[in-house]
Amino acid sequence: MPLFLVLKATLSENVTKVSIENTNESRAEFAFDLQCTSCRELHDSKVIINTFEEYAMPASKGTASFLMKCKFCSKELSVNLCAFEDEYLTDQSDDKWAKIKDVRKKHGLSKVKEDSFIPLSLDCRGCELIKFYPDTITFEVSLSSGKVMSCQLEDNEWYDYDDNLGEEVTMTDFSSSIIKGK
């Protein structure tokens, strides 16, 4: 059963779209706490995973974004990250929202509120990702003035100023959760 990373934040009214900067030239490095599902031991440091790197899985034809062996029980652990939603739109009347709702429903995510963004699906084998750290991610924020800004969260918040409209731009009360889908 796949897991999904769900992000939520309070945005200022002049924000129209938020996405994660994740290209081959500028790869998003997602940081998580990882726990082995066999021995339940928590890995002693954050693991950093991106969607572009692939590693051949031992004794398998598949690949994964991240591989490691649990240092406590020696079990093979793997995580495969896949992009799920490209962007979060603040205007729920946009035609794209109907498609987003359909895709969420197909994956058992219809109860995820519209004020949330689901950037990743997580296929974890032998482990669980239990906490996400947003400080390694660069977000791209589109504003009603047409301006696009890049930001990184500090203490789960970001504040800036849109010179075009003379308004403050904010992303506050950032939270994340990892939920099960189907």
Swiss-Prot record:
Zn(2+) binds at residues 36, 39, 70, 73. GO terms for molecular function: zinc ion binding. Signal peptide: none annotated. GO terms for cellular component: cytoplasm; nucleus. Keywords: Metal-binding, Zinc. Disulfide bonds: none annotated. Requires a bound zinc ion for normal folding and solubility. Present with 3970 molecules/cell in log phase SD medium. Belongs to the UPF0587 family. This is UPF0587 protein YCR090C. It comes from Saccharomyces cerevisiae (strain ATCC 204508 / S288c).
